[in-house]
């Protein structure tokens, strides 16, 4: 991140402020043959950053997944676990919404 976006704040503080401004929605969709897919939307950042987050989630959840159209898709129903992992990554609990 450039210093212009954060007014000269250190990058760590700038990154945390960015995380606090994001509202993340976690939902499950049923796909073909009754397969469930957890969809995480509302994360801002480049495709590279989203792929990094997706990669970390996939390894912690032992699930497959991908990044499509600015959303992370994970195979299976992982709503609660994804919320816990995102909170450990520094996203505030109040900004993470699980859609039933």
Curated annotation (Swiss-Prot):
The lineage of its organism: Archaea, Thermoproteota, Thermoprotei, Sulfolobales, Sulfolobaceae. This is Protein translation factor SUI1 homolog. PROSITE patterns: SUI1 (PS50296). One of its GO terms (molecular function) is translation initiation factor activity. Keywords: Protein biosynthesis, Translation regulation. GO terms for biological process: formation of translation preinitiation complex; regulation of translation; translation reinitiation. It holds the Pfam family SUI1. It comes from Sulfurisphaera tokodaii (strain DSM 16993 / JCM 10545 / NBRC 100140 / 7). InterPro entries: DENR/SUI1_TIF, SUI1, SUI1_arc, SUI1_arc_bac, SUI1_dom_sf. It comes from the Archaea. Belongs to the SUI1 family.
């Amino acid at each position: 991140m450039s210093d212009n976006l954060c007014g000269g704040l250190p990058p760590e503080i700038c990154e945390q402020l960015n995380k606090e401004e994001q509202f993340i929605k976690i939902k499950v969709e049923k796909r073909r043959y009754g397969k469930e897919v957890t969809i995480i939307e509302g994360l801002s950042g480049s495709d590279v950053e989203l792929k990094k987050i997706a990669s970390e989630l996939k390894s912690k959840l032992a699930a497959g997944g991908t990044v499509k159209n600015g959303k992370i898709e994970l195979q299976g129903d992982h709503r609660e676990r994804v919320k816990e992992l995102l909170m450990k990554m520094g996203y505030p609990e109040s900004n993470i919404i699980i859609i039933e």
